[in-house]
């Protein structure tokens, strides 16, 4: 996906990028590749691949959810900033918090935010399991997002405790999401969530399947969740 295709395909979806926003994506790409030489941020470094598989793929969430309001967003395990930083570039009014367990990725994100001149962004070096217990952040976000971090039964325990009641958990998945949903339904129920919508589409050019799940937070999450670091992965909430 070259820059012209990136721009026009977003335009088709009603997302018009200014020259400043296009410049921010250019800086993002250059910074990602530069830092990737000294630490492992991504296996994808070829320009057209980054624009497709990182930038465009992250923004696809906005094809199925309206980001036009100044929502507070928490991105769990964002790594090099996906999906929340590409969304922040497109929708500058968003208030973004990224939680990542690796300090060197947080260092990269702090540097990136300076280079992109982003405001209303916060980067927290923490495990989602401990972050989700903290007063002031627990059940405080309009939207919590994660892209391909873990299977749904595990991911729900990391993300739903952070979503305010009435808010949305957006899980961005690859193929075979149906099986994940089936296995994850019980966890959603236990944690206070309900699957509202699942959208399946093909990522352009490479035609690989993507699924975006919109999960509404219906009830408060029981206090015992999230459990201790590592437990959700070892003992997922499944029947």
Swiss-Prot record:
S-adenosyl-L-methionine binds at residues 77, 82, 128-129, 147. The keyword Methyltransferase applies. Keywords: Cytoplasm, Methyltransferase, rRNA processing, S-adenosyl-L-methionine, Transferase. Its EC number is 2.1.1.-. One of its GO terms (molecular function) is rRNA (guanine-N7-)-methyltransferase activity. It holds the Pfam family GidB. GO terms for cellular component: cytosol. It is an enzyme of class 2 (transferase). Disulfide bonds: none annotated. It is found in: Cytoplasm. InterPro entries: rRNA_ssu_MeTfrase_G, SAM-dependent_MTases_sf. Belongs to the methyltransferase superfamily. RNA methyltransferase RsmG family. Specifically methylates the N7 position of guanine in position 535 of 16S rRNA. This is Ribosomal RNA small subunit methyltransferase G. It comes from Bacillus cereus (strain ATCC 14579 / DSM 31 / CCUG 7414 / JCM 2152 / NBRC 15305 / NCIMB 9373 / NCTC 2599 / NRRL B-3711). The gene is rsmG.
